[in-house]
Amino acid sequence: MKYTYHLTIPYQDVDASRRIRLYTLENYLLNVAGKTADQMGIGIPTLLPMNYTWIITHLNLEMLYLPKHNEEIIVETWIERNAHMLSVRDFRIYQSQQDGSQQLIGCAKTVWAVLDLTTREIVNIFDHEMFDGSVDGEVLNMARAARLRPIQLDNLEDDTEALQAGEV
């Protein structure tokens, strides 16, 4: 099932160019995900009595346009799949046009897990009844997020000799 939210960009959420700040847009998506989970009966108010909470493990966002102050965006969201203790939630972001149409300006993919607050371990609760019928199944075609390679710290002590005071 898909859920849709209409949001107007307030002045405090834009930067000096009057466009929405990227981290603010990401917060919008997280808030929409939380509201949707609450409406589906799988939100934090449902999970906390079981001593569980949602955590986000990945967020991949692609934008063609960053909306400006006072522009309306429409965020459409759905659960792509629940598998292997992870839930994949997708988003499409549209900009409202003056003629009433909507233009696709971005998309996002998030990956979530449920954390046991006592053991601090990720748990599989997707076989519970509360998750029946929550998956829409539509796959959002997005490029996979790049993986960052770990920084090699070998021979770090040797490299520090080249630094002078005040260079860092």
Task: Place the predicted regions along the sequence by residue.
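Terminal targeting signals and extreme-terminal segments of soluble enzymes
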Residues: M1-V168
